[in-house]
Amino acid sequence: VTPAPRTEQETTIATLTLRTGFEVELLAPAGSDRQVLADDLAARCGGSVRRSSHTDSEPSAVPGVGLFRHLSPAFDVVGPDGAPVARLVDDITIEADVAAAPRTPPGHRGWYRVLCDDARLLRLVERHVDPAAALPDVLAPIAALFGTVVELVGGAARVNDATGATVAVAMPLPGGRERPCEVITPPLTRDHGAALDALLAPARALGFTVPVEAAVHLHVDGAPFRRPAAFANLVRLFGRWREPLWAALGTNPACRRLAPLPADLVALVERDEQTGWADLGAAARGTGVTKYADVNLTQLVAARPVRDTVEVRILPGSDEAAAIVARAALVERLLLRCLDDRPVPAPGADAVRDPAGALAALAGVPA
């Protein structure tokens, strides 16, 4: 997608310097779906759309099964040279607007989810199935792996192992789940606002809107924060400055899967003893760090990170590139402040009166 020209507002107010990936949560209008946007974006850049799967999890109603993990339809937009443009996926936290609208019948466009109660098995399933296959056929490679057959039960397909234990089930996509559309960008190194606008302006033109629970997530490279001083400052920023950050950024109170950092983690970085990164990272893993917090540090402290990023999750939902970049610019400056070995101080009284001003002062932004 060709980026739109940079607006005067973007040029003079908000410019990002860090390599940054964005996740922007949108909602397709009733009767439409995320593939419509994928096809439109591909047509605009002379690229193509590749069907893929998105992994997520949700609480299970089955006794003894805590979570059901699933694969849902995702769409990767690539340019004519094969370079990634955007990835469009479901987001199960988007519920209110879907529930309020008349439901479409299950299995929109023949779409389905593949469910499994074991993360390792689901990774095996994802590796072997064709995400574009029809529901009755998608699990055939898994049945072959286990030496069994696909059982068709009503509108679902199931594979059991030789003992009768269920490996995976494919079921029609619940009505309405075709509408949530999280737009995931590749890492952007320049012209962040223009690149975002090239994705969001077409979405607005197609009637996509910002859902009730929406958020915008930022991913920046994690490596610079894998030092004790920088990591401690990152924890201090999001641990001590939570209320000013929410106020200054306009965090959406309806957004789900946000939480403060564990108190044990905040205490850990204030200990007097000197320790190297390996020991600090291992200790941090034991404090209950979770992805679903205001800032996702799980990949930063993981022994084997899957995605080597720090994920900031508290920006409010928006479909306007300039607004997203303006908020991201403050976050970027605060993250850069964390790389300074001087400890990030606790907020003072001014942070209550003027949270945006206090954060700007902390970040070193000129008044």
Predicted regions and their residues:
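C-terminal accessory/tail domains of diverse enzymes
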Residues: 2-209, 223-367
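Active-site histidine-anchored catalytic micro-motif
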Residues: 213
